[in-house]
Amino acid sequence: MQVLHVCSEMFPLLKTGGLADVIGALPAAQIADGVDARVLLPAFPDIRRGVTDAQVVSRRDTFAGHITLLFGHYNGVGIYLIDAPHLYDRPGSPYHDTNLFAYTDNVLRFALLGWVGAEMASGLDPFWRPDVVHAHDWHAGLAPAYLAARGRPAKSVFTVHNLAYQGMFYAHHMNDIQLPWSFFNIHGLEFNGQISFLKAGLYYADHITAVSPTYAREITEPQFAYGMEGLLQQRHREGRLSGVLNGVDEKIWSPETDLLLASRYTRDTLEDKAENKRQLQIAMGLKVDDKVPLFAVVSRLTSQKGLDLVLEALPGLLEQGGQLALLGAGDPVLQEGFLAAAAEYPGQVGVQIGYHEAFSHRIMGGADVILVPSRFEPCGLTQLYGLKYGTLPLVRRTGGLADTVSDCSLENLADGVASGFVFEDNNAWSLLRAIRRAFVLWSRPSLWRFVQRQAMAMDFSWQVAAKSYRELYYRLK
């Protein structure tokens, strides 16, 4: 079984979000599971530099100009690169310029990505062609449409990592992207009078997956579907929509082997976690005290992530004696709010604006509770890292958070399935009730340790996801 992942970023070469983590880990897990998985990416500068052994496979003149298809390897995974400097050789973000304006030629830059994905199924590389083209998010959404236009030379899977980003472009660009105008239709890629790359993926793919079972269910509901609910309800009825939970890359995220931690530990040596907490308290300017629970946030600071709720609930958390360490950037109003809290509560609140991958590991190793109060969360990786590190996740019951964290209710504790704290309602009061439960459990150290050990024993390895995808691919054949 030969599978081509079509996407725009891959950890650690280029990362703007969780999509990169998935592409950095899933193909390798699939190869270990017996699937011949390869990845197709635009040759953005950071990616081009990382794939050092790239050789020319093919050269083509396309609707988006001249391109060279390269093939090389990264960490044992075969990587195809679309080398088109006039489109991709730009510094910084792959999607927008330094002023945060989307590039005006994004329609061509990402239509080309989908086009090459479909061409691969028609023999662009004479020595390897995919049985399944697996496209990820709107950037690759046209791949299933180009396959449909070519009579479907391969099966297609489209994975939704976040339905909020829809890849919308003016209708007149149908003239530029080499798809029949008949595709510009409500039964096609048209959405609100524009081209939607996301809808192209949803409409033309043989199967749609979302990155968790709960998110797959939620996106059939109006409040999560951004106008796509009709199509997604239909795909659900046809059995063409399912959820496959993302995994954790254990080569990168494991407290037993994580060289970024001051002290490594396992579920049997949890006492060694304490040194990480001490170091984190020092680094964040917090009072060094192992008796108080240290809550943490590692997140984009946006209302989608529910960080306004944390700001509102913060006085209640601090009154009970807790500490907060925050790493993130985003909404200027939220940034100012957290910086003001750090100034008002020195020694209790530590804030670092920005994102540093290495420091996120130190927070995960040192904190007692990781807060993920998202309004919606397709899968969420932060809570999975928390479970892995014995840093109990406190989450809102939505998307992948609902699938992965079980509340420390009395019955869950009795049944041995408790792994964190879960709240229902989208408000600070509901969040504060969960924070209160965390303090109550904290006051019973042996019970806290019991829940940590349960959390760390859970299996969210990529092998599980790789097996689910393999079964899906074979069902499509």
Curated annotation (Swiss-Prot):
CDD domains: GT5_Glycogen_synthase_DULL1-like
UniProt catalytic activity: [(1->4)-alpha-D-glucosyl](n) + ADP-alpha-D-glucose = [(1->4)-alpha-D-glucosyl](n+1) + ADP + H(+)
Species: Shigella sonnei (strain Ss046)
BP-aspect Gene Ontology terms: glycogen biosynthetic process
Alphabetized Gene3D superfamilies for the sequence: Glycogen Phosphorylase B (3.40.50.2000)
Superkingdom per UniProt: Bacteria
Pfam families: Glyco_transf_5, Glycos_transf_1
GO MF terms, alphabetically ordered: alpha-1,4-glucan glucosyltransferase (ADP-glucose donor) activity; alpha-1,4-glucan glucosyltransferase (UDP-glucose donor) activity
Keywords: Glycogen biosynthesis, Glycosyltransferase, Transferase
Family: Belongs to the glycosyltransferase 1 family. Bacterial/plant glycogen synthase subfamily.
Matches recorded under InterPro entries: Glyco_trans_1 (IPR001296), GS/SS (IPR011835), Starch_synth_cat_dom (IPR013534)
Residues at which ADP-alpha-D-glucose binds: K15
Job description of the protein: Synthesizes alpha-1,4-glucan chains using ADP-glucose.
Any one GO CC term of the record: cytosol
E.C. number: 2.4.1.21
Involved pathway(s): Glycan biosynthesis; glycogen biosynthesis
Record protein name field: Glycogen synthase
